[in-house]
Amino acid sequence: EHAQIVAPKDLPRFAALHVLPSMQPTHATSDKNMAGDRLGVARLRGAYAWRSLVDDGNRIVGGSDYPVELANPFFGIHAAVTRQDQQNQPAGGWLPEQKLTLVEALRSFTVDAAYGAFQDQAMGSLAPGMWADFILVDRDIVKVAPEQLWQTKVLATYVGGELKYQ
């Protein structure tokens, strides 16, 4: 849990030991203005190292850490993909070499989150026999500019295949 500040030499150990890193992407964008001063240059190399963890073969469990951060998953997906806050700062993203792709970020909040909860046989994806918990949103998040991901709004929520919110 909270695998956000890891000694760089320990990053490969997650995959080697089958430890599942859990990340809260909005922590990086909330912490970006103070992390350098508080962690120092050496420790910052292993901070919020999502790309390094994925490249080492890890699944990443994404979450919000609500109520510390807001629960909206699109805030976290935006932060994971852009490494920017909701004002889209800094330009190019903070520690941009650690960005995730949109597919990786979506997996971290869906399939891989279910895997981390030992629930991947029941939830996390849409497939026959799964619970069919899903949302409809106001935009095609694959086609929208990454800087706009955080603005995504939920139009409808289905739980167990039944409409619960519209």
Language-model features: locations:
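His/Asp/Glu-enriched, well-ordered alpha-helical/loop segment
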Residues: 8-12, 16-143, 147, 152, ...
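Histidine-centered active-site/metal-ligand motif
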Residues: 2
